[in-house]
Amino acid sequence: MNLKLSAIESYFFHRSRLNLHSCFYVGIKLNELPKKSQLIAALKYTVIQHERLTCNVFYDELKKENFLQNILEPLKFCDLVEYRHDWDQLGETEINHIFQRYNFSYNENKPLWKILILPNQNQMLLLTDHVLMDGMSAIHVWETFMEGLQMQQPVEIDETIYSPSLNSSTEKIMSAPLYGDWPIPWNWHIVRQLVSRLHYWFPQTVVKNNRNLIQFANYSFPKDLLDDKPSDGTQKYKVKNTNHQWEFRLSPTHLNDILQECKANNTSLTSLLGALVCTSFEKIAAHEYTGSFLKIELPMNIRKPFERVLKLPSDDKLAVGNFIAVIEFNHKLHQNRGIWDIASQIQRAIRSSSEDKIIDKVNEVKLLEVISSQQYIEDKISLNNGPSSTFEVTNLGFQTFKDACNTSLPFYIVDATFNEPQGISSIFSLSVISTPGNGLHCCISYPNTLTKVLEPHWQYMKDYLNLY
């Protein structure tokens, strides 16, 4: 494999290379942990199905470009799996430790992912560099892993999970999957030219936040985000990753009741969560922030739009990779509007972006093709007094992992979790995933300098969702 990075993958690459993003994780909890030999067999099966798992990003000196290429050395079990016998839980300390300590290097014959196993919790966490895959990809990887785990296979003694193929060729260069085929209307050709020139000559016109965007008095950016920032051109940034982590759950019955309410109001769970955060923000004392509106970022899975617009067969071609666009929604405060009214507005924005405006949404992502991703990232930090959005809601949805939650199986998924590190794009984040056995699992990550400030905010959410 010799694959060009898409524009968004190039953005993720530079963000990680600057040390501004370590990894994210999607984890599963099993009824019991497999034996090592069973893990080896399942991993071999998974790696065969998803070639990207055998790749790293390498710089081609001749072409002066980065490519996703197959690793040229074997990968052993110990390269991909680490046991954490010392962790009795996945709490705030452990979560922040993951984002502080686990990251991945480029231009090396090493993987861009790892599985952490917490034996005391029967839990397995897939940690991955974002350049390799998005959140839905991690779901697909776990689905494949569980398929391999259920198969009756010979006992594995050889711990080599991957061996470079003698027949594999790195000569043929493949374009970034599908993004290169996406239609660019004439007006977007004009926008691309304009953005390219503006970012080069007047970067603030492209990256500067609206001055009315909410910023907290107790959150100084980038001071409360970074421990270090480059001073001599060689030093990297260092993100604190000391966020407070609050997790809440909704039982399957409770989740079903809320989903029925969403259905009755023609909204989705994602829209409701976004509206709930907007409404609860009204409980925060006005002197704690400046600005008049919140901005929500809602990452959108664009696999189905790709299939629809490019007339692709519905297969596993889009299983693992980065196929996301971001929906932005602005909410003006103090409008005295109800939760379902706000949720309906958010839902309209989601529906419009995923249907009528999907050509535009993907072309917004493709604007990263015409600017320097690295400069854009650095400008976002140096030219602003806060992240570009107030909060992010990423909902991976209700996942059965292709029936891997079926309790009649020898190994089945009991629960799932999902989380991401402190970042440059939002002040706090909600990472959500739901399963049949344990319902909804939401991880909320926010700066520890805002713990007291946000107490009324979270209390309102607890009261609304009956989290007692």
Swiss-Prot record:
Q: Which E.C. number(s) belong to this protein? A: 2.3.1.-
Any Pfam family the entry gives: AATase
User: Which is one GO molecular function term here?
Assistant: N-acetyltransferase activity
- Localization per record: Endoplasmic reticulum
Where does this protein chiefly localize? Answer: endoplasmic reticulum
Among its keywords, does the record have Transferase? Answer: yes
Q: Which UniProt keywords apply?
A: Acyltransferase, Endoplasmic reticulum, Transferase
Cited InterPro entries: Alcohol_O-acetyltransferase, Atf2/Sli1-like
Functional description taken from the UniProt entry: Confers resistance to the sphingolipid biosynthesis inhibitor drug myriocin (ISP-1). Inactivates ISP-1 by converting it into N-acetyl-myriocin. Cooperates with YPK1 in mediating resistance to myriocin.
**What PANTHER family does the record point to?**
ALCOHOL O-ACETYLTRANSFERASE 1-RELATED
Name recorded for this polypeptide: N-acetyltransferase SLI1
User: What is the organism lineage in this UniProt record?
Assistant: Eukaryota, Fungi, Dikarya, Ascomycota, Saccharomycotina
